Regions:
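Active-site neighborhoods and metal-handling regions in enzymes and metal-associated proteins
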Residues: 1-171
């Protein structure tokens, strides 16, 4: 698998650190909750992923995701500003936005998901999480999250706890 979490090493997070972490988390949530037609290019979903970060006047200079397989970085799935690779059902890939500010620091969060048929709209696709490793709740500004985002995060963290990988809940 290919998973990344950022943590604060000692001390208490500043307001700016929480803001940056939460923007990157919102980017993952925007992607995880995206619904799109089959054969949508990876660049379209990449744009969805970047929206929370764009809205803060920031960006990152790498792709949002790549195919994941035996060699970790695999073809057939690519989320980037230049990707003309169409997303197909049953393709496994990463979702890994980040923010990096010179002289300040950076945050990168990464999950692995599979592209699957939407359960209600059979002509649409969506992402299903394959990796359950909790996020650092001391770095999240919950006031920045919508109700839908908070619900997704809570359900995700409960599943992480069930699997023994939550930093919020004890299993």
């Amino acid at each position: 698998t290919d998973t990344t979490r950022s943590f604060l090493s000692g001390g208490t997070a500043s307001t700016r650190q929480k803001e940056i972490y939460t923007l990157v988390l919102k980017s993952i949530l925007a992607t995880q909750n995206a619904v799109f037609p089959e054969n949508t290019w990876g660049s379209v979903v990449d744009g969805v992923a970047r929206q929370p970060i764009f809205r803060s006047g920031l960006n990152y200079n790498h792709g949002t995701g790549h195919g994941v397989g035996i060699n970790v970085h695999e073809g057939g799935y690519r989320l980037s500003t230049t990707s003309s690779t169409p997303l197909k059902e049953n393709t496994v890939g990463s979702i890994e936005p980040g923010i990096y500010i010179p002289g300040f620091g950076g945050v990168r969060l990464e999950n692995v998901a599979v592209v699957e048929r939407h359960h209600e709209h059979k002509n649409m696709l969506r992402f299903r999480t394959m990796v359950y490793v909790g996020f650092d709740h001391d770095l999240i500004d919950f006031d920045m999250l919508s109700e839908e985002e908070q619900t997704w995060l809570d359900e995700y963290e409960k599943e992480c706890a069930r699997r023994g990988r939550s930093f919020k809940y004890k299993s």
